[in-house]
Amino acid sequence: EAARLAQATIVDIVFHEFNPFGISGVVVIAESHLSIHTWPEYRYAAVDIFSCGDVLQPEVAASYLVEQFAAERTSIVEMQRGMFLNSSMPIVNRAVVAIR
C-alpha cells in the first residue's frame, strides 16, 4: 500500500514471515525498491525506500508506514546515491525527520 500511495510502479512483491514473528520483504518497483525488516520483539522496523527519477513520492510512503506502525519514534534520512557519485556535485545527506 505504501508503494501504491507513493505513485510507484509495482513490479513484484516478496515477503517472508519468520517464526515466531517478524517479516522481511521487498516491493520491487520500476523506480527501484522498498524493503522492510521487522523485529516485533524490539518494537523495531527498518524500512528503505530507494528511488531513481522524480515520480515516486517517498515521503508519502514513509508517512503511511509511520502511521500504520503507530511509531512512537522515527528516524528518516534522505540520502543521495548513484550517478551523483561520479559527478562534481557534492553529496548531501540530510535528516528529513529527526528522531522523535
Predicted regions and their residues:
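Polybasic/polar functional segments that serve as interface/processing modules
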Residues: 1-100
